[in-house]
Amino acid sequence: MKIRNSLKSAKLRDKNCRIVRRKGRVYVINKTNPRFKARQG
């Protein structure tokens, strides 16, 4: 999982990327290709 300042570029890396909010943190998850996971930090 990458920790990034801006998730906009992380979201655009793959068409299956979704932005989710969990416990006050913003995540990018990708069910089909989990290597695109990221968290905003």
UniProtKB/Swiss-Prot annotation:
Presence of keyword Ribosomal protein: yes
UniProt GO BP: translation
UniProt keywords, alphabetically: Ribonucleoprotein, Ribosomal protein
Transcription listed as a keyword: no
Signal sequence extent: none
Molecular function terms from GO: structural constituent of ribosome
A GO CC annotation given for this chain: ribosome
PANTHER family: 50S RIBOSOMAL PROTEIN L36 2, LARGE RIBOSOMAL SUBUNIT PROTEIN BL36B
Assigned protein family: Belongs to the bacterial ribosomal protein bL36 family.
Protein name: Large ribosomal subunit protein bL36
